[in-house]
Structures are given as C-alpha cells and as structure tokens.
Amino acid sequence: MYGSLSTHVLRCDGAPVPIALASLPLSQTTAIPETSVIDELLPVLAADSLPRLIVLGDDAALASVLTHLMRTERLHVEIGYVPVEKTYGSRAYQTGTGNAAAKRAVKGRPVETPLIRDDTGTVLVGRAEITGPGGEKLEGEAYVDDAQLFSGKVDAMIVSPMLDMPGVRASVQKNIIRRRRWLEGRAAQLGTPGAVVTRDGIANDRVLPRSSFYRHHENWLLVR
C-alpha cells in the first residue's frame, strides 16, 4: 500500500515538502487546517481499506486533524506526522523531523496510540500549559488519577501525552531549580479559581474554573 493513492499529504502553512513526500497527492491548507479541507479528503481516503493521511505541519496542525477525526468518528485513518522542526509532539511520539519523519510516515506501520483530549473535546498532541489569568501564578489543586500533583500556588501546570499507556503525564513549574517530577495516569484534573489553558501553542483567552485532560476511549493510529 505504501505510496499508493490511499496516502495523501496535508501541507499546512506552506511547510517545505520533503523529498519522500514529493510524489504523493497533496492538499494545501492553513497553519490550523480548515475542517472543510479535511472533509474533502475523507471520501478519497475512504475509498481504500487502509487510508493514510500525512500531516506536514506543527503540533497544532496535527491536533486539529485528530480533533476532527475524533469528533467525526474516523480514527481508523492512519496518521503520519511530519514536523519541519522538533516539537513537543515529535518528542512525545518519537517521529523525527523533516525527511526522516517523512520516510517513516510513508513506509512505517500504524501503531495504536493513546489519544489525549480535554474536557472541551480538543485533542492534545504536544503540550498544554496552564497558568493563572494574565500569566499569573496558578492557584488550585490538581490530581493525576488519585495522586495529588499540587495544592496551592505554582507558576504553571504542564500536561503532555505519552506514546504508551497510561497516556497522560503532568508536572508543575516552580521557581525552584530541581528536576521536574512527572506523574503519569489516565487523566490529569485541575480545580482552580481561574486558569488559562494554552494547548499546543494556541492560547484560549477564557478563564476556566477547571480543566481536565484524559485518555479517549478510542486510540489513534500513528504511523511509526
């Protein structure tokens, strides 16, 4: 199936096209892919029993694609990820970058991978940073499964997906120079007087009283 018509490239924001992807059908879209562009590709991909979509972009681009596939119940589509530069997502999923990532996206095999989402139904690919409003300290209490992550005030709470189970890991930022402690689990939950969440570099200006990131009941198919 490799290099067949079942494989399509979604090029985001004019990203440079690696040599390994040059011969594949390609669609152009914005930095954050428009759902209409994704929807146009789905019938083409659906014509094959093993559809594969390669996202050429950054973490926010991949998160947008996965969010749409999750909401439309199309997580059977194999996803290759080709970031131009290192990202939190490329580290978490060990995809590599540039042409090395492109070769893996074309020739690799799909691996069931935990899909991490938040309570708004948005997928997280690389990293979420949660702070107080205006970048102030974050006040509240957070847990990863049953283990307390913090209670009180911290500079920020960091949440990241994992390549394997249990799926989610979280830590806090403090003005203390020491190795960061990560807690792993199925879900990371925060209760707070007010928090602002930045997902994969995209800030949400809404001040929230709570935030949760957790493993979706269905995995996604990452080509590795």
PLM feature spans:
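Catalytic core of DAGKc-family lipid kinases
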Residues: 3-22, 29-49, 56-201
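Extended hydrophobic packing segments that form well-structured cores
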Residues: 203-224
